[in-house]
UniProtKB/Swiss-Prot annotation:
Self-association and partners: Component of the mitochondrial ribosome small subunit.
Protein role: Essential for fertility (male and female gametophyte functions and development). Required for the integrity of female gametic mitochondria. Modulates male gametophyte functions, including pollen tube growth and style penetration. Involved in mitochondrial-driven cell-to-cell communication in embryo sacs during female gametes maturation (including embryogenesis initiation and endosperm development), especially for reciprocal signaling between central and egg cells which regulates reciprocal development.
Tissues expressing the protein: Expressed at high levels in reproductive organs and, at lower levels, ubiquitously.
Localization per Swiss-Prot or TrEMBL: Mitochondrion
Organism: Arabidopsis thaliana (Mouse-ear cress)
Name of the protein: Small ribosomal subunit protein mS75
Keywords: Developmental protein, Mitochondrion, Ribonucleoprotein, Ribosomal protein, Transit peptide
Length: 420
């Protein structure tokens, strides 16, 4: 409002005719379109030859006669009038004063634009007024931009609060970072991996979509199977359920422990350090993370190995029915392991080969190598989550037995106390 009042004051000071003052003009024309057009124009303080209206431009044609016989030379009809509307020739030639809008490819080799010519003809007061109007336009644009940014910030508060709640949930419960993926996101994941598997690897997709690597393997396999089924049928599959879950994800609230968290026995572990020992110890959270990461890698390798074997069963390469173990007409094929140095087996020395019924031998093929690898025991303790251990049937039975024994001991103690 302060800038607007300054512009009105400058308009009223520029025009010499009271009927053409800017205040009356703005009151009579209150629309925003006229106000904008008025701010893009400059008014001349005089209509004389001050650099705007020259003697040969046709605006200062003298007229004959005298004025009222007063004897004053200034009021003769031959002299130019001092009364002016504040309008110059440029206002009627259609040349805008100030900035050019929709300028079409200005070139530095061409002559200066019409706006530059008009600005060069204006006096210092008019140039200052035009610059002030341009500053006012810039101020309005900045205010509109700030309003748009503020509106976008206010509209995105709900989404940011939901993201913060998810992050707080992750901090409160480590490992619970799984979220429901839409079918469109799974399709996009499969498309990226199919087009460029070297760039969009399993690890990168798991990191981008914030899910487990095992889950990425399963999604890619299912999407590949869907594509194969569509190719066989010649039409797309029914995805009504997937589209329903995509449109209404609140119906399906997923809560998966996407990252393995190791269960540690939090008990003191005192060690006697040598004299003069000046070292540091690791933080408990750091140790917990390292153990969890190591166990997660072990579980991932085991999952991939079992998943590849299950895919072979899916394709029919592994026969597990009751007729697959019958003796063929040629005879049995026997797997023989040759012991190494000092009777060592496995990686320590021995190697396996296949003995055929005719007495010959051959090395193991790929499928037989998979069988041999699956027979190798895992040299590690079983990784079981705390919740599974707590509520497993075996633990429940042991707990009930211990509870019954404690009850029997209490009853025996009470009986012994009464007898004494």
């Amino acid at each position: 409002m302060y800038n607007l009042s300054r512009i009105i004051y400058r308009f009223s000071s520029v025009s010499l005719n009271p009927s053409t003052r800017a205040s009356g003009f703005l009151l009579e024309n209150a629309s925003s379109k006229i106000l904008q057009s008025a701010t893009n124009r400059a008014f001349s303080a005089k209509s004389g030859s001050d650099g705007v209206g020259g003697d040969d431009n046709g605006w200062n044609i003298s007229t004959g006669g005298s004025f009222g016989g007063t004897g004053s030379a200034d009021l003769d009809w031959d002299n130019k009038s001092m009364w002016s509307t504040g309008l110059t020739k440029e206002h009627f030639d259609g040349v805008s004063v100030g900035r050019q809008k929709n300028a079409a490819n200005p070139s530095s080799d061409n002559t200066p634009s019409d706006s530059g010519d008009v600005m060069s003809k204006l006096g210092p007061k008019e140039v200052a007024l035009v610059n002030e109007m341009n500053e006012y336009d810039d101020l309005l644009k900045e205010i509109e931009q700030d309003n748009r940014q503020g509106r976008a910030f206010v509209d995105g508060i709900k989404q940011r609060m939901m993201e913060i709640s998810v992050l707080l949930k992750q901090v409160k419960e480590p490992g619970a970072r799984g979220s429901y993926l839409k079918d469109s996101e799974k399709t996009e994941m499969y498309r990226l991996h199919k087009e460029n598997p070297e760039v969009y690897t399993i690890e990168r997709l798991a990191k981008d979509y914030r899910i487990m690597r095992q889950r990425v393997h399963a999604i890619l396999f299912l999407k590949e199977d869907e594509e194969e089924e569509e190719r066989k049928l010649g039409r797309p599959l029914d995805d009504s359920v997937d589209r329903l879950l995509d449109e209404y994800p609140e119906f399906f609230i997923s809560h998966d422990r996407e990252f393995h968290v190791a269960s540690l026995n939090y008990k003191p572990d005192f060690k006697v350090m040598p004299e003069g020992w000046d070292g540091t110890i690791k933080d408990m959270d750091e140790v917990h993370y390292e153990i969890s990461k190591k166990e997660d890698d072990m579980l991932y390798e085991e999952f991939v190995r079992r998943f590849e074997f299950n895919k072979m069963k899916w394709r029919g390469e592994v026969m597990c029915h009751k007729y697959s173990r019958r003796r063929s007409s040629e005879g049995w094929k026997i797997t023989v392991e040759k012991l190494g140095a000092k009777g060592k087996r496995g990686a320590g020395g021995g190697w396996k080969f296949m003995s055929l019924p005719d007495g010959s031998s051959r090395p193991l093929n790929e499928m037989e190598k998979v069988y041999v690898k699956r027979e190798t025991p895992l040299r590690r303790r079983s990784i079981i989550s705390t919740e599974v251990m707590r509520y497993s049937p075996a633990n429940q039975k042991r707990r009930s037995k211990r509870k019954q024994k404690r009850k029997e001991r209490r009853i025996a103690c009470l009986k012994a106390g009464k007898q004494t």
